[in-house]
Every structure is written in C-alpha cells, then in structure tokens.
Amino acid sequence: MAQPERKHALPRGTVLRDSYRIESILGAGGFALTYLGSHTGLDQKVAIKEYMPDQFAVREADRATVRPRADAGDDYKHGLRRFAEEARTLAKFRHPGIVPVTDIFEENGTAYMVMEYVEGESLHQHLGRVGTLDEPGFRAIFDPILAALAEVHANGILHRDIKPANIYVRADGSPVLLDFGNSREALGTKAQSLTVAL
C-alpha cells in the first residue's frame, strides 16, 4: 500500500515533547495528520495525530510550527479546542474496542494526541482481502464494535462516522473503532458548525 503524502507533514525524525519521534505518515485528512511514531524512552510504536487543518493553517518554514491563516484564527482556535476535548474524552475509555489515547499535549502552535499503534488493517481492506463475511466472521467483528459503541453511548458520546475505514482489524483478528473526530456529545451541547476530523 502506498504511503500517504502530505506537503505539510512533519519531517521524519522530528521529536515531539522530547519523547516521540516521527517515523512516517499513516494518514491525512482535512483537519489532521496521523503519524507512525516511536516513544524514544520506551522503544514502543505509537500513533500520533496532529491537528493540522489545511483550510485554517499553514506550516512555517521551520517545518514544525503551525500558524493559523490570517483570516481563520477563530476557526483554528475553535478546532484546536475541539481536538483537545476529543482526546480527553477518548482518554477516559478503557475498552478493547476503542483505541487507547495515552497522551495529549500542545507544541509547535498546535495539539497532538498520542494513541496505541494498532497493527492490522481497516475493515475496508480486510473485506477486500477476504471477501464477504459469514455470520461467525461478521459477529466476531461487530459484536465487540457494538459493545464499544454501547460504552461510548453510555457516556453521552455519538461516534457519527461508522464505516469500514474507521473499524480496524488487529493482527489477532480483534476489531477496534477509530476516528472519533465526528463524534459529538449527545446531550447538553448545541450543534457546532465545525467538526474536527481526528
């Protein structure tokens, strides 16, 4: 599979918070970049998501600092707050069907979310490889995902973007739900015009 390219991505070897080294880019969306990283002290792979909204920000010449575009400062700040809120919300969950968030921090004028690196493939890729699922195969993936969603819903959060690309099948066959960027608290908040895609 070809590696995603993104002209605003942090260079390989960049060290964040004196602990996390950028190894490569895993994915790029309109609001965030996801990197394969390593925790330099623990010698562990991690996934690092960086808030980097193309329409609201640019990367400075130092190839690290993120600066809001002149006409988008308020939108950038709003999205940054949402990104941090989503990370803090996800960090509360301890469920095998939800990827653990282990750290969040601000640096370079933006925010970063550190998560367990999940080895495997998206359900979309999995279905392309194995074809149609029989009932036991379907239940092996969706029973744990439904249990994860029940946990999320019990805490007043709606995922709002369930699709094969956002369900990852680990190397051991267990599924995990990714990308809570379109999630929203079900009660007690008004609709926001900006949704941060984590």
Where are these regions (language model features)?
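Activation segment signature within eukaryotic-like protein kinase domains
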Residues: 141-142
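AlphaC helix of the eukaryotic protein kinase fold
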Residues: 60-92
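Conserved short submotifs of the Hanks-type protein kinase catalytic core
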Residues: 108-122, 126
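Activation-segment/catalytic-loop signature of the eukaryotic protein kinase fold
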Residues: 104
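Protein kinase glycine-rich loop
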Residues: 23-29, 34
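Protein kinase catalytic-loop region centered on the HRD/HxD motif
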Residues: 147-157
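Conserved N-lobe loop of protein kinases adjacent to the ATP-binding glycine-rich P-loop
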Residues: 38-45, 52-56
